[in-house]
Amino acid sequence: MRVVPTLAAASLALGAVAGEHVERQLILGGGEVPIGTKTYATGIRSTADGNAFCAGALVSPTHVLTTAACTGFEPPKFVAVGTHYINGTKDGEQIKVVSAQNHTLNNASSASYDFALLTLEKPSKFSPIKLPNPDDSDIVAGMWTKVMGWGDTSYPNGTRSNELQSVGVEVWNNEDCARLFVVDNSSVCAGGAPGRDACVGDTGASLVKEKGQGDADDILIGLSSWGSGCGDPGIPSVYSRVSTAIEWITSVTKVQQV
């Protein structure tokens, strides 16, 4: 478990919440994602075949969106796109990272605008996930979304999952979340159902709105950022709200949202 050193300011507002503040790195209470689906889900690695230490999402053929926190753990050297597994090279693509760029408004002390873009050495053959509308119309409090990653499947003292996992979590409005955490408009909260959460082992995991039968209609709503404890009843996790970063993403990737 990594205690979040950048959230000291946020901790002042957490008197009502028990537990320590941890980077969101676990898929708790979920199930295995079918092989060959959610291929935009990306593992971030130090070596081509090593364990993913963070997650992200393919948002253009040559760019992966993750959290700024993930660029601070250790330098992202490779991404694994379209793979079902936490490590190895038996499926998907392993592509070298040539540069990493944090959001221009990122504030590590408050985890505000917790975004980073990784530029890849070559284009991925997999389809990028759709980005949300910048007017925030794709997010409605009370809707159900899915978060996916390779983090621990139990808490505490869990072990990493070898296979991509996902779990359904409910979106909160920021007013309710602000009663528990210090959040701004670059964040969105989701979760709160007992034992169903993102937690220890996979910061940057995709929070996705499923609109149709297939992955082509999925929309990237958020990226797993931080929280307090894992799977506690009535306590959500905090995600980076992707709709607030569309202009910056477009400026870096040079790809216009269709």
UniProtKB/Swiss-Prot annotation:
Organism in which the protein naturally occurs: Phytophthora infestans
GO MF entries: serine-type endopeptidase activity
Function, in words: Secreted effector that suppresses host plant glucan elicitor-mediated defense responses. Targets host endoglucanases and inhibits the endoglucanase-mediated release of elicitor-active glucan oligosaccharides from P.infestans cell walls.
Signal peptide coordinates: 1-19
CDD domains on file: Tryp_SPc
Protein name stated in the entry: Glucanase inhibitor protein 1
Domain Peptidase S1 as annotated: residue spans: 27-254
Description of what induces expression: Expressed during infection and the expression levels increase with disease progression.
Subunit structure: Forms an apoplastic complex with host endoglucanases in tomato leaves during P.infestans infection.
Recorded name of the encoding gene: GIP1
Biological process according to GO: proteolysis
Annotated compartments: Secreted
Glycosylation sites: N87, N102, N107, N157, N185
